[in-house]
């Protein structure tokens, strides 16, 4: 069964340790610009959202790659870049709807989350467990529960509004 990163942004404290661990584990340097996961900050709201490749089923990055350097590893459930084939054209960067691909100016190649070959270091080092690596089916169940909860709240609000309108 394939696994996926699951981000619970409500747990994220914005410490950015995931970014540092990622860059060190991939490139041997502590540089958030080289991280495959980025923490987006909305400080006024106190909201921090770790973002990384969503490993899309119909990955736009894969579809636009002119040399087929991006493919899907079905066993691991990830989309990955073959760096020996990548020509650094950056078409995939523009195609990614999540902004999850970056470009290494030195190597002239794109880079993205590769799930650390099955042991994501961001998960291992996230002390608040805002980032987890769980079965795809479990992610689906969590998303369904979340959507049902939002619909329930919206339904209750709509019922209350309707009751006030018909007084």
Predicted regions and their residues:
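Membrane-helix exit/interface motif
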Residues: 69-71
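Mid-length scaffold segments of soluble, non-membrane domains
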Residues: 74-75, 99
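Generic N-terminal amphipathic, Lys/Arg-enriched alpha-helix
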Residues: 1-7
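A positional/architectural concept
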Residues: 16-24, 28-30, 35-42
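Flanking helices and flexible, charged tails adjoining ferredoxin-like Fe-S electron-transfer domains
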Residues: 2, 34-35, 40-67, 83-167
């Amino acid at each position: 069964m394939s696994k996926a990163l699951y981000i619970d942004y409500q747990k994220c404290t914005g410490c950015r340790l995931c970014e540092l661990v990622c860059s060190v584990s991939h490139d041997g340097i502590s540089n958030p610009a080289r991280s495959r996961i980025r923490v987006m900050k909305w400080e006024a709201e106190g909201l921090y959202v770790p973002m990384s490749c969503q490993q899309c089923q119909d990955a736009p990055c894969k579809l636009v790659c002119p040399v087929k350097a991006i493919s899907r590893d079905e066993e691991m459930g990830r989309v990955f870049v073959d760096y020996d084939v990548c020509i650094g054209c950056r078409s995939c960067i523009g195609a990614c709807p999540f902004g999850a691909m970056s470009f290494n100016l030195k190597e002239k190649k794109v880079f993205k989350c590769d799930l650390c070959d099955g042991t994501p270091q961001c998960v291992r080092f996230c002390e608040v467990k805002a980032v987890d690596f769980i079965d795809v089916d479990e992610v689906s169940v969590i998303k369904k529960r979340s959507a049902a909860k939002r619909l329930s709240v919206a339904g209750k609000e709509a019922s209350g509004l309707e009751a006030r309108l018909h007084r």
